[in-house]
């Protein structure tokens, strides 16, 4: 097979395998006199198909031999169709499309898509497994599904550490079993000589195989068939291969002594067996256990020849006759998998090699083996992808929508004419979505290019995907290569990470603001009609795959989806929590930092209202902060007050109370807990002390951020009962969650004197690790220490400038100071720095305090005033960094969703501090 071209020499952003000149058409292929050439053409095409199926799909390009060939009239050829049917028994049309372009036939190959509903989904496609088993008297080359089943059995047996043994059977002359043939064969094996035409008293079975060769080339024939039978016996229950016995008459003939050198034959057999590929699940990794014995065959006391007996013991793991006939794209060529690679991919074992697909462009990372590996993303992302798609990318509108809106607004404002140009480019499509990004290259893990203004992905009805790359410098020679690679990698991501099951191709197009500019041959990129999004359901499936891809990357779109994803998780968690409302009227809810307890508390108010059908003014929310109270008032119709107001007022109509951020409470104005309980659980004198009613009193607190442990008014931890602890819903980026986990770990290792033993017992590193993995999304966390105030301000200004250029808004950002008195000092430095960097058009830079959290401006306030509130991007500013500052790290980190920047004026943080 010719080495395929997969670089930018090809028009399609795909792996393009060139198989040379091929004869197509049923009649033409029937007339071929060179049967060897016919088989070679067939084999080259089928190998290329297998390799592309296993490597994310692509295109096979064949030069048509007959100049009068017409695909519509002549078809492919029966032998080619049969080969495709064997490779894809459930329908080749699901994976293959054909298109004639002049004197070339293109075969479009979709990425292999395992049937996830199957108990044993096949992760890759194979021509033959070359893993054999005995089936009575036959050696069967197992189908891929049967091979997978065998591998699973071997894997489980190795994990159990027990080998299946067959107990000895009591002798009974009236019973005959297959095991008897094995015993009789073992008796033959013990002999030293046999007689010519002696008839053996047993036949072939699961454990016995007879072979007789009349050809002159005995040794080559033995070496040809030996791997099949050794693999079959080793993978079943062991057995005997007896060479020199007729399988029909069971007579001993042997191999004539003139044709065989017994010592050489024995050596050849041993060498052949020792070279067989094996795969081990066990730690011992033994070799194939076999014994070769040569028996003399005599004819009237004269040496006639030899019988060769190969005894094969059952193998602990898997023995292959040869490497599986399965192919992938590696180093720009269709390459056969080794047995080890094949097993790892079949079983989807994470340690599988990741370099099976390489790209000729060193600076552009290749799709690698992820094209045929299972998607690696949080399970909940897959569960919520439909809801997220409908929230951000609804397909019901009969227009072309530009998303994300904030980025598009910024982009079109800065670059006049771009919006009209994109509308022209997307004409005549009337229904679809164009997803803009500052760099789709960066979003899929490639290097960003400064000469690219933006990328835009068109997902439209009745169209394949189109990736528009808007160039700043149209003379840049690398533009076409850039667009080609981004399209290829984005397609791979949609399949491997997003799990898109349909046929997908992305057409790259280069444009500039002055008008359309297409690279050479750009207009020649055509995909079959089946690659178009035919229905709204197809669009939704593709957009849901894009949602998953985006959530697993770092971008504005990822952050917008991530915030909504965390909101869905919180709503789900509240559904579970609210199931306790009916039977648990009083409850202490201990929440880890990052679990968004205020959001849980707000949703609990709604659940109380719906469950008990009460008026909003009968439900009271109590918190410590005025700013948090104002925020909650905008979120719910229920009454919301601070603890101070609660202690000073009377609330005769209140039936249910939810108390939030009680870790900040103190008993300065009285016993708030007793007052709350007297409202929700009042007693009537003279009525036998019976409860008038049992209202809800739910108390939310973060036990790691208790400020006044001695005077906070809470019952002592042992008396906080009934109690629920929420540790498995850390709703922020993985990098931020790790900071919180590290801080909590250090707190428990060196606890302050006012921390209760109960709080220490709450933190279990294993449980926290599970919480991180369950909902982990990528984010950003950076730490800088030993900075001046000016350096801190410059860092914040530069970061904000970069973020705003990518479409983030001032309302996404909170700059939090450790102390309230630091706000004024930082504000002046920040304003100067932002004027220098022209952040958000410097004249518009406005800082708001926590009270303006629902406004459009950057928040600049103390972390304490921001209690209970969150923003996507948080800068934590502190005058110093001490190793005892875990409390403030938790405060900063628990306010951030996707971006956290910790900046310290003094004190160098050790390298391992945040690990």
Curated annotation (Swiss-Prot):
Disulfide bonds: none annotated. Keywords: Endonuclease, Hydrolase, Nuclease, Nucleus. GO terms for biological process: cellular response to magnesium ion; cellular response to manganese ion; mRNA catabolic process; platelet maturation; rRNA catabolic process. It comes from the Eukaryota. It holds the Pfam family SLFN_AlbA_2. Residues 157-167 have a biased composition (Basic residues). Its EC number is 3.1.-.-. GO terms for molecular function: ribosome binding; RNA endonuclease activity. Residues 204-389 are annotated as: Required for endoribonuclease activity. Residues 390-569 are annotated as: Required for ribosome binding. The keyword Ribosomal protein does not apply. C-terminally truncated SLFN14 endoribonuclease: Requires manganese and magnesium for its endoribonuclease activity. Residues 157-176 are annotated as: Disordered. GO terms for cellular component: cytoplasm; nucleus. Its cofactor is Mg(2+); Mn(2+). This is Protein SLFN14. It comes from Oryctolagus cuniculus (Rabbit).
């Amino acid at each position: 097979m010719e080495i395929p071209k997969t670089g930018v020499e090809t028009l399609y952003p795909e792996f393009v395998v060139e198989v040379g000149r091929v004869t197509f058409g049923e009649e033409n292929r029937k007339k071929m006199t060179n049967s060897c050439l016919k088989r070679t053409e067939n084999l080259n095409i089928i190998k290329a198909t297998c390799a592309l199926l296993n490597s994310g799909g692509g295109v096979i390009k064949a030069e048509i031999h007959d100049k009068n060939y017409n695909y519509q009239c002549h078809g492919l050829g029966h032998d080619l169709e049969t080969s495709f049917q064997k490779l894809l028994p459930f329908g080749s049309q699901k994976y293959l499309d054909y298109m004639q372009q002049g004197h070339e036939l293109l075969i479009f190959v979709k990425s292999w898509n395992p049937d996830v509903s199957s108990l044993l989904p096949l992760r890759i496609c194979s021509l033959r497994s070359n893993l054999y088993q005995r089936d009575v008297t036959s050696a069967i080359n197992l189908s891929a599904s049967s091979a997978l089943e065998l591998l699973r059995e071997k894997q489980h047996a190795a994990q159990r550490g027990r080998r299946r043994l067959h107990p000895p059977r009591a002798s009974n002359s009236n019973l005959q079993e297959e095991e008897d043939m094995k015993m009789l064969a073992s008796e033959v094996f013990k002999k030293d000589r046999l007689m010519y035409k002696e008839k053996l008293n047993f036949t072939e079975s699961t454990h016995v195989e007879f072979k007789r060769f009349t050809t002159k080339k005995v040794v080559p024939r033995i070496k040809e068939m030996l791997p099949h039978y050794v693999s079959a016996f080793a993978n079943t229950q062991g057995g005997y291969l007896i060479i020199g016995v007729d399988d029909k008459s069971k007579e001993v003939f042997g191999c004539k002594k003139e044709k065989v050198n017994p010592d050489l034959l024995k050596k050849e057999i041993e060498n052949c067996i020792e070279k067989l590929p094996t795969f081990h699940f066990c730690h011992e990794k033994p070799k194939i256990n076999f014994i070769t014995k040569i028996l003399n065959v005599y004819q009237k006391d004269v040496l006639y020849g030899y019988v060769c007996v190969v005894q094969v013991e059952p193998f602990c793991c898997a023995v292959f006759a040869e490497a599986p006939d399965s192919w992938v794209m590696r180093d720009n060529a269709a390459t056969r998998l080794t047995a080890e690679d094949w097993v790892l991919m079949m079983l989807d074992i994470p340690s599988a090699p990741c370099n099976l697909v390489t790209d000729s462009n060193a600076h552009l990372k290749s799709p690698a083996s992820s094209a045929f590996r299972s998607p690696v993303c949080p399970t909940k992302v897959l569960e919520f992808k439909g809801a997220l798609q409908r929230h951000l990318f609804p397909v019901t509108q009969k227009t072309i929508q530009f998303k994300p809106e904030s980025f598009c607004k910024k982009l079109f404002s800065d670059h006049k004419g771009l919006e009209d140009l994109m509308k022209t480019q997307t004409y005549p499509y009337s229904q679809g979505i164009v997803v803009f990004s500052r760099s789709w290259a960066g979003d899929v893990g490639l290097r960003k290019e400064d000469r690219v203004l933006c990328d835009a992905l068109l997902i439209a009805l009745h169209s394949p995907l189109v990736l528009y790359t808007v160039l700043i410098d149209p003379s840049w020679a690398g533009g076409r290569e850039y667009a080609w690679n981004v399209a290829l990698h984005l397609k791979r991501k949609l399949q491997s990470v997003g799990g898109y099951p349909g046929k997908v191709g992305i057409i790259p197009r280069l444009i500039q603001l002055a008008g359309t500019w297409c690279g050479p041959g750009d207009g020649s990129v055509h995909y079959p009609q089946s690659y178009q999004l035919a229905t709204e359901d197809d669009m939704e499936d593709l957009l849901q795959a894009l949602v998953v891809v985006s959530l697993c990357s770092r971008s504005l779109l990822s952050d917008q989806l991530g915030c909504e994803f965390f909101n869905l998780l919180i709503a789900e968690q509240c559904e579970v929590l609210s199931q306790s409302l009916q039977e648990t009227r009083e409850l202490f809810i201990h929440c880890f930092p990052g679990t968004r307890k205020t959001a849980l508390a707000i949703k609990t108010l709604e659940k109380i209202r719906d469950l008990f059908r009460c008026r909003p003014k009968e439900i009271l929310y109590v918190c410590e902060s005025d700013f948090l109270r104002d925020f909650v008032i905008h979120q719910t119709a229920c009454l919301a007050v601070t603890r101070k107001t609660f202690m000073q007022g009377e609330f005769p109509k209140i039936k249910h109370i939810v108390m939030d951020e009680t870790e900040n409470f103190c008993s300065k104005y009285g016993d708030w807990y007793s007052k709350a309980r007297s409202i929700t659980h009042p007693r009537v004198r003279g009525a036998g002390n019976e409860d008038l009613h049992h209202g809800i009193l739910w108390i939310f607190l973060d036990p790691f951020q208790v400020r006044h442990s001695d005077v906070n008014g809470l019952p002592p931890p042992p008396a906080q009962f009934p109690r629920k602890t929420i540790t498995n819903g850390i709703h922020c980026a993985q990098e931020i969650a790790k900071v919180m986990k590290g801080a909590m770990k250090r707190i428990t290792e060196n606890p302050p004197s006012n921390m209760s033993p109960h709080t220490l017992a709450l933190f279990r590193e294993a449980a926290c690790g599970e919480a991180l993995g369950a909902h982990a999304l990528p984010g950003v966390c950076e730490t800088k220490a030993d900075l001046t105030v000016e350096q801190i301000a410059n860092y914040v200004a530069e970061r904000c400038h970069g973020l705003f250029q990518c479409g983030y808004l001032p309302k996404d950002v909170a700059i939090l100071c450790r102390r309230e008195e630091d706000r004024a000092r930082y504000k002046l430095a920040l304003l100067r720095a932002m004027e220098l960097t022209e952040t958000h058009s410097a004249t518009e830079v406005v800082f708001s305090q926590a009270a303006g959290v629902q406004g459009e401006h950057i928040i600049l306030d103390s972390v304490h005033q921001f209690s209970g509130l969150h923003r996507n991007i948080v800068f934590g500013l502190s005058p110093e960094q001490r190793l005892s500052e875990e409390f403030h790290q938790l405060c900063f980190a628990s306010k951030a969703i996707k971006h956290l920047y910790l900046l310290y004026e003094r004190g160098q943080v050790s390298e391992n501090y945040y690990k």
